[in-house]
Design a protein with these regions (language model features):
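Two-component/phosphorelay signaling modules centered on CheY-like receiver
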Residues: 9-34
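Acidic, metal-coordinating helix/loop segments flanking the phosphotransfer/catalytic sites
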Residues: 35-53
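Acidic catalytic/metal-coordinating carboxylates
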Residues: 38, 64-67
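Conserved phosphotransfer cores of two-component systems
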Residues: 47-51, 71-78
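Active-site T/S-Asp motif of two-component receiver
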Residues: 56-57
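Receiver (REC) domain active-site loop signature in two-component systems and cognate sites
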Residues: 60
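A short, hydrophobic beta-strand element within the central beta-sheet of small alpha/beta folds
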Residues: 78-86
Length: 86
């Protein structure tokens, strides 16, 4: 399982990563957690290898999470999308 954490705030990415890692460990599940500071960086990585799920911050500088989701859906309809905000 590959999970993307996309947020322009490093502290928010770190917090979500910790929470996800804790929940995965509690369930005995393994996943590759990757962090991205922009929608553009996430989409570039997704072209190389698809993600199982992506947590997208709605309000990011530049490309928003909603814009990244729309772009992703043009090529990948299977990735689970979860929208976040602070």
């Amino acid at each position: 399982m590959r999970i993307a954490i996309v947020d322009d705030l490093s502290g928010e990415r770190a917090l979500l990563r910790e929470q996800l890692a804790r929940q995965l460990a509690r369930r005995g599940a393994e996943a590759e957690l990757l962090e991205f500071d922009s929608g553009e960086a996430f989409l570039a990585a997704e072209k190389e290898r698809r993600f199982t799920a992506a947590f997208l911050d709605i309000y990011m500088e530049g490309m928003t999470g909603m814009e990244a989701a729309r772009a992703l859906r043009k090529t990948d309809t299977d990735c689970l999308l979860v929208f976040t905000t602070t």
